[in-house]
Amino acid sequence: MTNINVRNYIDESYGLFINNEFQASDSGETLTVSNPANGEDLAKVARAGKKDVDKAVQAAHDAFDSWSKISKEERADYLLEISRRIHEKTEHLATVESLQNGKPYRETSTIDVPQAANQFKYFASVLTTDEGSVNEIDQNTMSLVVNEPVGVVGAVVAWNFPILLASWKLGPALAAGNTVVIQPSSSTPLSLIELAKIFQEVLPKGVVNVLTGKGSESGDAIFHHEGVDKLSFTGSTDVGYGVAQAGAERIVPTTLELGGKSANIIFDDANLEQVIEGVQLGILFNQGEVCSAGSRLLVQSSIYDELLPKLKEAFENIKVGDPFDEDTKMSAQTGPEQLDKIESYIKIAEEDDKANILTGGHRITDNGLDKGYFFEPTIIEINDNKHQLAQEEIFGPVVVVEKFDDEQEAIEIANDSEYGLAGGIFTTDIHRALNVAKAMRTGRIWINTYNQIPAGAPFGGYKKSGIGREVYKDAIKNYQQVKNIFIDTSNQTKGLY
């Protein structure tokens, strides 16, 4: 393992970030954050409780009036300054992200952190072009449409892309003029707390408040808090049900980006070199811990026997290991719970004669990796899309492969899922690509690539994969409410009474 001086990047302990100050939790309790690549403890973070949530929400509420009333240009300048400072600290923040999450530094330094910075920059531009409208309904009647912030936003983000997912919430929420209480996962909170140091230097007091704690404790308290006017959550569908219920109970608008079991469809005219890279992007990027992962690989029967051996070889040549080794292509799963979940699905495959593990399927413990949570890139062949392995989200570097004969069968298999977050199509026939894309019941379709999520392209799911869209200009509407000002310009009575 690369020898990283952790204290150059991570403090020994962190408090809650409330009203621009780092402070201990009301209970004084803490949580320990560990490095999943070697099992070593990284830092202690404050464990927020209900009183801390109350305090953070009050700080956000107190800051809302002044923050929401500043000019668009000034608010955009704040966002641009945050973006600039994130870019300046790319090496620092990317190192923190890799240490706490286990993902390769080559990903955090070129994707996670730069794209997080870009979200603030992008929504600064969205803000300055976000305009209401005037409609002259008739000669004596005028309708003004005004976009206004919702108020205090309560957000909780998952552990797989901590700083990036936080930026997906914070960029549009702040641009719209809201204040925010946000909580990262208890297993990966450090990059967002480090980001809070930038907020402390740049933003007015109380505009962003960062809590650390358990999702079932402080996270739940955020979602049920009477002072929170908008909910935003990225995580599992199981937890998403509870967030949706919390929003429904108080009639609070809710944005959800949840699970997926996305189909990556390979047609027989596809460029196989591009396919092999695309399949790996789909399921090995971020160790397969991606809600949009191409975890179901649908291969046209006529090229199945040609493609599978090449894919097997490619998976077996992936270097898994030290996240700071520049040759590492895949690193540690985020923790023991996730590794256990992956292994439970491997056991299902091993005990079922309808499933064939073509390659992988084992934890990696050699070459100094025994203290971390590393897993082999895995391919499992199945012949029934109703199989548990094809229907449930594994959330790891495990792809299940199925055959299809024609375009219509591919569409039917792809749509046979309770999820609808993403999907991929590999073909050189643009007509086929567009026809299949239109027929797939999913929010994002990649054609001849996979897992590209830049600012400016809407991302979000159909069905049980969520509600709302992110990383796109319309995402600002998630954090706005529309006011109509209806004006009678006639200066005359209507004669009705």
UniProtKB/Swiss-Prot annotation:
It catalyses: an aldehyde + NAD(+) + H2O = a carboxylate + NADH + 2 H(+). Its EC number is 1.2.1.3. The keyword Ribosomal protein does not apply. It is an enzyme of class 1 (oxidoreductase). The keyword Oxidoreductase applies. Belongs to the aldehyde dehydrogenase family. This is Putative aldehyde dehydrogenase AldA.
